[in-house]
């Protein structure tokens, strides 16, 4: 057998083994319900990933709600797109700027509570297929919201509803109740090299 033929046979065997593993995992997954997803870590891409799922859900005609607990001074591309092109998406932002800009704990707690009150009805409404709670973890880390209340709401949402939570940290309890936890690692970031945030890429 030639060298190329051996490589081809080895590749085919590896792919067949991989397919068997994937098929077995698919066959074993027989429960039908919404999922809880936590996108955390210190790397870039958590919110971007969440909005990718928003686009995916909209492609299937699903009802989507998006709550952003931290809003910077700069308009984001996703905010512009959703408001201009996707009026059916229930979209709400806290609107006080980043908490490290305001430096007013009382005001931030009040804003977090008001924003959470916008999220709660979505988490109780079975007509919502997907709810994104962007940067919610900070509200827990800063103790702006009751962890017990947030955990209870996430655990008791409608069975078919999926929820995506983004942000660094969030605590052990949040990780434990989520079905999928992905940690985005900061390996290298343009900002650290002095490169400005790019419109359409970073915001």
Residue ranges and their predicted role:
Residues 32-33, 60, 127, 159:
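Residue-level preference for short coil/turn positions at secondary-structure junctions
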């Amino acid at each position: 057998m030639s060298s190329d033929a051996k490589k081809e046979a080895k590749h085919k065997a590896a792919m067949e083994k991989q397919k068997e593993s994937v098929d077995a995992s698919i066959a074993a997954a027989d429960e039908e319900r919404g999922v809880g997803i936590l996108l955390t870590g210190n790397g870039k891409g958590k919110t971007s990933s969440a909005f990718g799922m928003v686009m995916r859900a909209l492609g299937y005609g699903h009802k989507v709600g998006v709550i952003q607990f931290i809003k910077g001074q700069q308009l984001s591309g996703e905010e512009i797109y959703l408001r201009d092109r996707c009026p059916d998406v229930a979209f709400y932002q806290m609107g006080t700027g980043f908490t490290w800009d305001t430096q007013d704990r009382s005001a931030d707690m009040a804003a977090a509570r008001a924003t959470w009150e916008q999220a709660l009805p979505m988490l109780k409404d079975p007509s919502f297929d997907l709810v994104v709670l962007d940067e919610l973890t900070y509200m827990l880390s800063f103790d702006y919201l009751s962890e017990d209340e947030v955990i209870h709401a996430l655990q008791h949402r409608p069975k078919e509803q999926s929820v995506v939570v983004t942000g660094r940290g969030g605590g052990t309890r949040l990780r434990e109740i989520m079905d999928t936890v992905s940690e985005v690692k900061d390996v290298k970031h343009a900002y650290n090299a002095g490169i400005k945030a790019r419109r359409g890429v970073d915001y």
